[in-house]
Protein backbone atom coordinates (compact mmCIF):
# COMPACT_ATOMS: atom_id res chain seq x y z
CA UNK A 1 0.00 0.00 0.00
CA UNK A 2 1.22 3.49 -0.79
CA UNK A 3 2.55 5.63 2.00
CA UNK A 4 0.19 8.52 2.72
CA UNK A 5 3.07 10.80 3.75
CA UNK A 6 4.89 10.22 0.45
CA UNK A 7 1.67 10.82 -1.51
CA UNK A 8 1.04 14.02 0.49
CA UNK A 9 4.56 15.29 -0.29
CA UNK A 10 3.97 14.68 -4.00
CA UNK A 11 0.59 16.45 -3.80
CA UNK A 12 2.20 19.36 -1.97
CA UNK A 13 4.71 19.73 -4.81
CA UNK A 14 1.82 19.77 -7.30
CA UNK A 15 -0.21 22.29 -5.27
CA UNK A 16 2.68 24.77 -5.03
CA UNK A 17 3.78 24.34 -8.66
CA UNK A 18 3.37 27.21 -11.12
CA UNK A 19 0.52 25.73 -13.15
CA UNK A 20 -3.21 26.49 -13.40
CA UNK A 21 -5.71 25.28 -10.81
CA UNK A 22 -7.16 22.86 -13.38
CA UNK A 23 -3.69 21.42 -14.05
CA UNK A 24 -3.06 21.05 -10.30
CA UNK A 25 -6.36 19.22 -9.86
CA UNK A 26 -5.75 16.92 -12.83
CA UNK A 27 -2.25 16.08 -11.60
CA UNK A 28 -3.60 15.27 -8.12
CA UNK A 29 -6.33 13.06 -9.62
CA UNK A 30 -3.76 11.24 -11.73
CA UNK A 31 -1.38 10.78 -8.78
CA UNK A 32 -4.04 9.52 -6.37
CA UNK A 33 -5.72 7.32 -8.97
CA UNK A 34 -2.48 5.70 -10.07
CA UNK A 35 -0.72 5.41 -6.70
CA UNK A 36 -3.52 4.57 -4.25
CA UNK A 37 -4.72 1.05 -5.13
CA UNK A 38 -8.21 1.44 -3.63
CA UNK A 39 -8.88 4.79 -5.36
CA UNK A 40 -10.73 3.63 -8.46
CA UNK A 41 -12.24 7.00 -9.45
CA UNK A 42 -10.91 10.37 -8.31
CA UNK A 43 -12.53 13.65 -9.31
CA UNK A 44 -12.99 17.25 -8.35
CA UNK A 45 -16.29 19.07 -8.43
CA UNK A 46 -16.38 22.88 -8.37
CA UNK A 47 -19.23 24.79 -6.77
CA UNK A 48 -21.63 27.24 -8.31
CA UNK A 49 -22.50 28.70 -4.91
CA UNK A 50 -25.25 31.00 -6.20
CA UNK A 51 -27.18 28.16 -7.87
CA UNK A 52 -26.18 25.54 -5.28
CA UNK A 53 -24.76 23.14 -7.85
CA UNK A 54 -21.54 21.19 -8.26
CA UNK A 55 -19.92 20.81 -11.68
CA UNK A 56 -17.45 18.09 -12.58
CA UNK A 57 -13.90 19.28 -13.05
CA UNK A 58 -10.74 17.21 -13.61
CA UNK A 59 -10.99 13.49 -12.86
CA UNK A 60 -9.17 10.17 -13.16
CA UNK A 61 -11.06 7.02 -14.08
CA UNK A 62 -14.07 6.13 -16.16
CA UNK A 63 -16.19 9.02 -17.50
CA UNK A 64 -19.29 9.75 -15.43
CA UNK A 65 -22.71 11.04 -16.42
CA UNK A 66 -22.83 12.96 -13.14
CA UNK A 67 -21.37 16.21 -14.44
CA UNK A 68 -23.78 18.38 -12.44
CA UNK A 69 -25.06 17.65 -8.92
CA UNK A 70 -27.42 19.79 -6.84
CA UNK A 71 -26.54 20.52 -3.22
CA UNK A 72 -28.18 17.91 -0.99
CA UNK A 73 -28.32 15.22 -3.72
CA UNK A 74 -26.14 12.16 -3.27
CA UNK A 75 -23.03 12.03 -1.12
CA UNK A 76 -21.40 14.91 -3.03
CA UNK A 77 -24.42 17.16 -2.61
CA UNK A 78 -24.70 16.27 1.07
CA UNK A 79 -21.04 17.10 1.68
CA UNK A 80 -21.49 20.48 -0.05
CA UNK A 81 -24.60 21.28 1.96
CA UNK A 82 -23.21 20.11 5.33
CA UNK A 83 -19.71 21.51 4.67
CA UNK A 84 -18.12 18.37 6.04
CA UNK A 85 -16.40 15.19 4.93
CA UNK A 86 -18.56 12.15 4.22
CA UNK A 87 -17.09 8.64 4.39
CA UNK A 88 -19.44 5.93 3.14
CA UNK A 89 -18.18 2.41 3.91
CA UNK A 90 -21.01 0.69 2.03
CA UNK A 91 -22.80 2.71 -0.66
CA UNK A 92 -25.60 0.11 -0.79
CA UNK A 93 -26.60 1.24 2.72
CA UNK A 94 -26.66 4.95 1.80
CA UNK A 95 -30.21 6.14 1.12
CA UNK A 96 -29.18 9.31 -0.73
CA UNK A 97 -26.59 7.65 -2.99
CA UNK A 98 -26.26 8.45 -6.70
CA UNK A 99 -24.80 5.35 -8.34
CA UNK A 100 -21.93 6.00 -10.75
CA UNK A 101 -21.00 2.37 -11.31
CA UNK A 102 -22.24 -1.00 -10.09
CA UNK A 103 -18.64 -1.69 -9.02
CA UNK A 104 -18.46 1.15 -6.46
CA UNK A 105 -18.60 -0.15 -2.89
CA UNK A 106 -17.38 2.83 -0.84
CA UNK A 107 -16.89 6.57 -1.26
CA UNK A 108 -15.28 9.56 0.41
CA UNK A 109 -16.14 13.18 -0.35
CA UNK A 110 -14.09 16.02 1.14
CA UNK A 111 -15.25 19.61 0.68
CA UNK A 112 -12.88 22.42 -0.27
CA UNK A 113 -13.86 25.30 2.00
CA UNK A 114 -12.73 28.91 1.58
CA UNK A 115 -14.06 31.73 3.75
CA UNK A 116 -16.66 29.32 5.20
CA UNK A 117 -18.05 28.54 1.72
CA UNK A 118 -17.76 25.21 -0.11
CA UNK A 119 -15.98 26.14 -3.34
CA UNK A 120 -15.42 22.57 -4.48
CA UNK A 121 -14.71 19.04 -3.34
CA UNK A 122 -12.78 15.91 -4.07
CA UNK A 123 -14.82 12.75 -4.59
CA UNK A 124 -13.22 9.30 -4.55
CA UNK A 125 -14.96 6.01 -5.30
CA UNK A 126 -13.60 2.57 -4.51
CA UNK A 127 -14.52 -0.91 -5.65
CA UNK A 128 -13.40 -2.04 -2.17
CA UNK A 129 -15.86 -1.94 0.75
CA UNK A 130 -14.81 0.37 3.62
CA UNK A 131 -11.73 1.46 1.64
CA UNK A 132 -11.24 4.83 3.31
CA UNK A 133 -9.49 4.99 6.67
CA UNK A 134 -8.70 7.91 8.96
CA UNK A 135 -5.30 8.41 7.29
CA UNK A 136 -7.02 8.75 3.90
CA UNK A 137 -9.44 11.32 5.30
CA UNK A 138 -6.66 13.31 6.96
CA UNK A 139 -4.54 13.37 3.79
CA UNK A 140 -7.46 14.37 1.57
CA UNK A 141 -8.59 17.10 3.98
CA UNK A 142 -5.05 18.48 3.99
CA UNK A 143 -5.00 18.50 0.16
CA UNK A 144 -8.34 20.34 0.08
CA UNK A 145 -7.24 22.93 2.67
CA UNK A 146 -4.15 23.73 0.62
CA UNK A 147 -5.99 23.78 -2.71
CA UNK A 148 -8.57 26.23 -1.30
CA UNK A 149 -5.91 28.94 -1.40
CA UNK A 150 -5.89 28.76 -5.22
CA UNK A 151 -9.65 28.82 -5.81
CA UNK A 152 -11.21 32.20 -6.58
Identify the function of each model-found stretch.
Residues 12, 126-152:
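Juxtadomain coupling helices with adjacent low-complexity linkers
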Residues 47-53, 57-99:
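Regulatory sensory and allosteric helical modules in signal-transduction proteins
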Residues 41, 109, 121:
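Short hydrophobic/aromatic beta-strand element in the GNAT-like acyltransferase core
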Residues 113-126:
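Sensory-domain boundary capping and coupling elements
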Residues 106-113:
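A short, aliphatic-rich beta-strand micro-motif
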Residues 36, 99-104:
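Short loop/turn motifs at secondary-structure junctions and domain boundaries
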Residues 1-63:
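Intrinsically disordered, low-complexity terminal regulatory regions
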Amino acid sequence: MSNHKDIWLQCETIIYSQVTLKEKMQAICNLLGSQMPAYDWVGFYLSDVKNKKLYLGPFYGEPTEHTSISYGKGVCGQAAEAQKTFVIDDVAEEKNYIACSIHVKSEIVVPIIKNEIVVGQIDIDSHTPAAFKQEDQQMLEKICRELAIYIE
